[in-house]
Regions:
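Single conserved hydrophobic/aromatic residue that forms the stacking wall/gate
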Residues: 1-6, 10
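Iron-sulfur cluster-binding cysteine motifs and their immediate structural context
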Residues: 50-73, 80, 91-118
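Amphipathic alpha-helical blocks and their helix-capping loop/short-beta junctions
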Residues: 113-128, 133
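Short Fe-S-cluster ligation motifs
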Residues: 75, 79-96, 127-151
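Immediate flanking context of iron-sulfur cluster ligation sites
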Residues: 37-46, 87-98
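A short, charged helix-loop
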Residues: 32-35, 39, 70, 74-79
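Loop-centered beta-sheet repeat module
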Residues: 11-65
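Long, compositionally biased charged/polar accessory segments in the mid-to-C-terminal portions
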Residues: 143-146, 151-168
Length: 168
């Protein structure tokens, strides 16, 4: 098992760095060295339940227990079938992923946006209207999301998500 004092696991089961919040990317190094693990970290959430209270699908069942199959991120990224009808009205405007639990976390209030240009949105996305999203072709999808995690859901998955939001 891996250990690190660089981040802690919090109630919503995301890694959190006390200085950077939970908006960061992970990397790993494969080493052939024996390293001494850092001391275990303490719970910094205290009695806060903002992430649990804010989750519209109740995917965070209780502290440190997340039912991924209820998470908006699962429905919009990983699910390959139809989004279940009971989720109607709970997805707000999330057509890919969801950051509600991160948005309400007090540890993220001072998080800095990345300055990494590779994480900037494709310029064509910045001015898209709802109509543009509904009319998005597979070719345009491939062009604007070729270097993006959004390609994981695929064009058909994104169309499903957009239609589902439009039906709600």
């Amino acid at each position: 098992p891996a250990s690190s004092a660089a981040s802690d696991v919090y109630k919503r089961q995301l890694l959190l760095n006390k200085h950077a919040g939970s908006y960061f990317y992970l990397a790993e190094m494969m080493l052939d060295l024996e390293l001494e693990p850092d001391a275990p970290v303490t719970d910094h959430c205290g009695s806060c339940t903002r992430c649990i209270d804010a989750c519209p699908t109740n995917a965070i069942i209780r502290p440190y227990v997340v039912d991924g199959s209820k998470c908006i991120s699962y429905f919009t990224i990983e699910l390959r079938g139809a989004i279940p009808e009971p989720v109607h009205g709970q997805m707000e405007n999330w057509m890919f992923g969801c950051d509600i639990c991160q948005e309400v976390c007090p540890w993220n209030r001072h998080a800095s946006p990345t300055t990494e240009p590779r994480f900037s949105p494709h310029p064509r996305l910045l001015d898209m209207t709802k109509s543009d999203w509904l009319d998005l072709t597979e070719d345009v999808f491939r062009e604007v999301f070729k270097d993006s995690a959004v390609k994981r859901t695929g064009w058909m998955g994104l169309q499903r998500n957009i239609s589902f939001l439009g039906d709600a």
